[in-house]
Amino acid sequence: MYRDSPLMSTPVANDSRSDEGPSGKLSPTCLFPSFTCDFLDGDSSFECCSIDPLTGSHYICRRSPRLLTNGYYIWTEDSFFCDPDGHITLNPSQTSVMYKENLVRIFRKKKRTHRSLSSLLDPRASKSWLHGSIFGEVDSLPSEDLWLDGIRSLGSDLDCSLSDGWESQKPVTDTSESSSSGYILPQSLRESSQSSSLQLQVKASGHFEKNSLVHSRAGLMHKVSFQAILLAVCLVISAYTRWFVGGELASIFTCALLITIAYVVKSLFLNLARYFKATSCARFDST
């Protein structure tokens, strides 16, 4: 198998007649170069054995441009034969051309990464869930960013429209006054926004204080009711022990009940004092 042989090619006339003998015989170079390796090179050329009947000159064969670069000639011993006079005749039925095609994939699909079950169950993949930091790197939602950008753009458009209207009403000579007024208007808008934010903060703090007072009052009522019930139970037990049981056992029960009553009364007065102190501070802050 040989690559790109010059056979089966297009003949080109050669003007040189130096190789032609005086009796019209073929030159030695006309013989088929089957025993040389020069003709295997695709860029080399050799003289064919055919003669132009008009000029009597030999043809120089070159590689045909119609032959693809990936073509191969398959020669056998029966592909050509040479007569005693040196004429070479090709047998096309015994000479074949084989082309080796280069398959190129034009459309290449991107490989999708298929995660295996082991990678999904890897504890390192769920590290963010375990530490609770899956939303730690998220600063704000995209909707909030878009909302803030829209407010900024509206504020800038409002400032520009106000300044343009003010400058259109002023004459040309009062350019400095118009620029100063255009600078004052955004300041007034900023001051109004700051005052509104302060009012919102005051309202929120007042609402929080009211809620704290309500919760403290409910907790105090729960504690006071429990301590009052405990005090009443202690008094009833002391009276019954004094009435039905006498002697040293009654004195021991009475001493234990007095200690319990003292502890309950002390905690009750402390809770009442804290409650009245908190209410007075809240009223003073509200005024």
Swiss-Prot record:
Keywords: Membrane, Transmembrane, Transmembrane helix. The keyword Transmembrane helix applies. It is a multi-pass membrane protein. Residues 1-25 are annotated as: Disordered. It is found in: Membrane. One of its GO terms (cellular component) is membrane. The keyword Transmembrane helix applies. Its main location: membrane. The chain crosses the membrane at residues 218-238, 244-264. Belongs to the TMEM71 family. This is Transmembrane protein 71. It comes from Mus musculus (Mouse). The lineage of its organism: Eukaryota, Metazoa, Chordata, Craniata, Vertebrata.
